[in-house]
Amino acid sequence: MARVTVEDCLEKVDNRFMLVMMASKRVKQLYKGAKPLIDPKNNRHVVTSLREIAAGKLSAELSSKRSA
């Protein structure tokens, strides 16, 4: 995959807002030391998280709990 686009990710996640939430949460996990699910190839964490989503390595899980 030469470039990752929003359209690539939207094939896996239907909602743009959910995509943003997933990517931002994954970026935080990567910054805290989580292992990448794909080869990062010297990419920034944002690009790595989007590549993981486009590759189908991450999925959204909705919770009925609301945080205050």
UniProtKB/Swiss-Prot annotation:
Task: Show the Pfam families listed in the entry.
Answer: RNA_pol_Rpb6
> Does the keyword Cytoplasm feature in the UniProt annotation?
no
| Gene Ontology MF term list | DNA binding; DNA-directed RNA polymerase activity
Domain of life, source organism: Bacteria
Q: Name one GO biological process term.
A: DNA-templated transcription
> A Gene Ontology CC term for this entry?
DNA-directed RNA polymerase complex
Reaction catalysis annotation: RNA(n) + a ribonucleoside 5'-triphosphate = RNA(n+1) + diphosphate
Q: What EC class does the entry list?
A: transferase
Question: What EC number(s) does this enzyme carry?
Answer: 2.7.7.6
The UniProt entry, under InterPro entries, shows:
DNA-dir_RNA_pol_omega (IPR003716), Pol_omega/Rpo6/RPB6 (IPR006110), RPB6/omega-like_sf (IPR036161)
Give UniProt keywords alphabetically.
DNA-directed RNA polymerase, Nucleotidyltransferase, Transcription, Transferase
| Role noted for this protein | Promotes RNA polymerase assembly. Latches the N- and C-terminal regions of the beta' subunit thereby facilitating its interaction with the beta and alpha subunits.
Quaternary state and interactors: The RNAP catalytic core consists of 2 alpha, 1 beta, 1 beta' and 1 omega subunit. When a sigma factor is associated with the core the holoenzyme is formed, which can initiate transcription.
Q: What family is this protein classified in? A: Belongs to the RNA polymerase subunit omega family.
Record's protein name:
DNA-directed RNA polymerase subunit omega
Question: From which source organism is this entry?
Answer: Trichlorobacter lovleyi (strain ATCC BAA-1151 / DSM 17278 / SZ)
Gene it is expressed from: rpoZ
